[in-house]
């Protein structure tokens, strides 16, 4: 069993984009920003416990940080991890419903 403190640190924020909205409508998938060291099992457990929904599958990827300029200096944004969480049939979780 994963400790509750760890579950709270795994999920960072919902990732709101046009692609994420389409995924939610078509395949009942939510997109989340998660901790870089989070595993699929931790993400699944955190979503099920915190949002009280049934998770079917979790897919993850690491988004590489962009190179950005600030004046003459060149910097780089940090890499971050994104999780596509597919909910079971009949389950619903709406992050952007009130944003319209």
Curated annotation (Swiss-Prot):
Q: What is this protein called?
A: Large ribosomal subunit protein uL23
Keyword Ribonucleoprotein applies: yes
Gene label: rplW
**Source organism per UniProt:** Escherichia coli (strain K12)
Q: How does it assemble?
A: Part of the 50S ribosomal subunit. Contacts protein L29 and trigger factor. Might also contact SecE and probably does contact SecG and SecY when the SecYEG translocation complex is docked with the ribosome.
Task: Report keywords, A-Z.
Answer: Ribonucleoprotein, Ribosomal protein, RNA-binding, rRNA-binding
A Gene Ontology molecular function term of the record: rRNA binding
Q: What does this protein do?
A: One of the early assembly proteins, it binds 23S rRNA; is essential for growth. One of the proteins that surround the polypeptide exit tunnel on the outside of the subunit. Acts as the docking site for trigger factor for Ffh binding to the ribosome (SRP54) and to nascent polypeptide chains.
Record annotation: effect of changing residue 52 to K: No effect on trigger factor binding
Domain of life from the UniProt record: Bacteria
An example of a Gene Ontology cellular component annotation for this protein is: cytoplasm
InterPro entries assigned to the protein according to its UniProt record, in alphabetical order: Nucleotide-bd_a/b_plait_sf, Ribosomal_uL23-like, Ribosomal_uL23/eL15/eS24_sf, Ribosomal_uL23_CS
Any one Gene Ontology BP term: cytoplasmic translation
In the record, the note on similarity to other proteins reads: Belongs to the universal ribosomal protein uL23 family.
């Amino acid at each position: 069993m994963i400790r509750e403190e760890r579950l709270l640190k795994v999920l960072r924020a919902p990732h709101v984009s046009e692609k994420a909205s389409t995924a939610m409508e078509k395949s009942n998938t939510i997109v989340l920003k998660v901790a870089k060291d989070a595993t699929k099992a931790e993400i699944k457990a955190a979503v099920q416990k915190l949002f009280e929904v049934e998770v079917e599958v979790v897919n993850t990827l690491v988004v590489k940080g962009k190179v950005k300029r600030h004046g003459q200096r060149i910097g780089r944004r940090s890499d971050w991890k994104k999780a596509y969480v597919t909910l079971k049939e009949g389950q619903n979780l709406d992050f952007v419903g009130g944003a319209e």
